[in-house]
Each structure stands twice: as C-alpha cells, then as structure tokens.
C-alpha cells in the first residue's frame, strides 16, 4: 500500500477512534490482525464489546465507505472477532456488536453506524 494511502488510513482510523471515545467508548485494542482478517478497533461500550470497521472512500459515487462492507467483508470481520474472543476468553462472555465508521470526502466526514450488522447475518 502506498505511504500516502497508509497515512490517510491511519489518520481516518485515529479520527474514528476519537469520535467513538467522545461518545464514551473505551479502546481495548486497535489493529488486531488475524489470519484472514483485521479488526480496526475493538472497544467497550458500557457492558458490550464493539468490533469497529473503519472504511474510507475519497469519492462516494459508488456509495460511501460503508457500502464496501459487503457480505464477504462482514464474514471476515466475524471470523476475526471469533479469533479475538478465542484469544481473550475473559471478554468472550460479553455481549458483542459490529459497528462501522464510514468516512468519505476530502476532508473526510465521519458517520458512525452503530450495530451495522450482526454475526448471524453473515
């Protein structure tokens, strides 16, 4: 991935984290990599564990970043979340949800989609 694109992705992820922290969520871990998938942000929201996918598109002609979270991507996120919970059994009993932070435009405008999809939808 080109350096400028990597920097943009890191900046959008940091902005998404700040947005969620302002809303009261607390970071558990960022950029957790597992075979077949990556979890951008894992956060606590009260008693719930939240797996957050951050998606950026400079141009939203074909839909914003959230439009790119198709069934294949959702399935990868669910698998990565299962692997995360297997590695962190103390968190496995918590209720979980999947959120998406959609970033589009220049400068990026963020939209938080709470409970964007459910694991059993995949």
From Swiss-Prot:
Family, similarity comment: Belongs to the UPF0102 family.
InterPro entries (alphabetical): Restrct_endonuc-II-like (IPR011335), tRNA_endonuc-like_dom_sf (IPR011856), UPF0102_YraN-like (IPR003509)
Name of the protein: UPF0102 protein XAC0764
GO molecular-function terms, A-Z: nucleic acid binding
Pfam families named in the record: UPF0102 (PF02021)
């Amino acid at each position: 991935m080109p350096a400028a694109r990597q920097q943009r992705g890191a900046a959008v992820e940091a902005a998404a984290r700040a947005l969620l922290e302002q809303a009261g969520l607390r970071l558990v871990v960022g950029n957790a990599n597992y075979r077949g998938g990556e979890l951008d942000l894992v956060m606590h929201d009260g008693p719930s564990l939240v797996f957050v996918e951050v998606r950026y598109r400079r141009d939203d002609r074909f839909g914003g970043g959230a439009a790119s979270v198709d069934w294949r991507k959702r399935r990868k996120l669910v698998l990565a979340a299962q692997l995360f919970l297997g590695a962190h059994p103390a968190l496995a009993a918590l209720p979980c949800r999947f959120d998406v932070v959609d970033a589009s435009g220049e400068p990026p405008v963020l939209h938080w989609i709470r409970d964007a999809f459910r694991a059993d939808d995949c």
